[in-house]
Amino acid sequence: MIRLQKFGEIVGTSRSWKLLSSTIAKRYSSSSNGVKEMTVRDALNSAMEEEMKRDDRVFLIGEEVAQYNGAYKISRGLLDKFGPKRVIDTPITEMGFTGLATGAAFAGLRPICEFMTFNFSMQAIDHIVNSAARTLYMSGGIQACPIVFRGPNGPAAAVAAQHSQHFAPWYGSIPGLKVVSPYSAEDARGLLKAAIRDPNPVVVLENEILYGKTFPISKEALSEDFVLPFGLAKVERPGKDITIVGESISVVTALEAADKLKADYGVEAEVINLRSIRPLDINTIAASVKKTNRIVTVDQAYSQHGIGSEIAAQIMESDAFDYLDAPVERVSMADVPMPYSHPVEAASVPNADVVVAAAKKCLYIK
């Protein structure tokens, strides 16, 4: 599993920076077959750099984003390129710097507000929800708030209950916010660039375990003009027997499960990468369900009021319901605060075997 690989590369320490420095010396590399590749970390970094060059109203603000190059080195080199007025270190006060960033957006700038982890965004949720998300509506469309809130989200590795929460259901329920959750380097680059250019607040939920993962990247995605539209999911693996839907690192779990289903049962699973939480691309999901007649959702949030619950409800309310041959199955985080113990933590987070079991239930395989 990705979450167990090269742990030293994903923690925000000076030691991890030494481990990483040799692998991110350039934006992308070419594999042995000539396919260009890029890490999610470099995709996010290049997206911010290009948008800061493109628009001098864009600036980055947050804890350790400047002199330390970011806790996870996402902002590596930006201070040297743009200076301390556009790459701004802050004290440890999420309420303070989020309020500053939101006010700057109201004044016409385009802040990128980084949370070291989205768990800390709880300290600033009033600014995000009551100020950034609602002011356009409450001002009768007069006062926009072009701001990006970004940082790592969801379970990581042995960081316990207060640092492992998944915020897609939280922010995905708020009118006035757009919420995206990238899986691949191409997702991260295209969605972040689109978020920075958007005239309204966008929440970008990243995953720290994916930061160091390398993905193939197309020539189109390397263009400075590349953006991905919100509300458009991607079929990562075509299939005909069952639909598996995930977002961010849950796509990894879904793809692993699809491989197991193929190898063990000859089942061809279609895997959908949501990319966008709000707006949600229910049309792509429904089209897949009409083909496969079965669906399993996978995410690392809690099942109650979660992403899978929303997908299940919308499928039930759509004409895709008539195509279902089995109830929707949800695979999600165990309904407990995240344990610190690694073995218990691993048992709390969805894995491929759990997804396979859910798929077998849908397919009536004993």
From Swiss-Prot:
SMART domains for the chain: Transket_pyr (SM00861)
Class in the EC hierarchy, top level: oxidoreductase
Residues engaged in binding K(+): I147, A195, I196, D198, N200
Catalytic activity of the protein: N(6)-[(R)-lipoyl]-L-lysyl-[protein] + pyruvate + H(+) = N(6)-[(R)-S(8)-acetyldihydrolipoyl]-L-lysyl-[protein] + CO2
Entry EC number(s): 1.2.4.1
Cofactor: thiamine diphosphate
Record flagged with keyword Oxidoreductase: yes
Predominant cellular place of this UniProt entry's protein: mitochondrion
Residue sites binding thiamine diphosphate per the record: E94
GO biological process, one term: aerobic respiration
Entry function: The pyruvate dehydrogenase complex catalyzes the overall conversion of pyruvate to acetyl-CoA and CO(2). It contains multiple copies of three enzymatic components: pyruvate dehydrogenase (E1), dihydrolipoamide acetyltransferase (E2) and lipoamide dehydrogenase (E3).
PANTHER family hit by this protein: DEHYDROGENASE RELATED (PTHR11624), PYRUVATE DEHYDROGENASE E1 COMPONENT SUBUNIT BETA, MITOCHONDRIAL (PTHR11624:SF96)
Name listed for the protein in its UniProt record: Pyruvate dehydrogenase E1 component subunit beta, mitochondrial
UniProt source species: Schizosaccharomyces pombe (strain 972 / ATCC 24843) (Fission yeast)
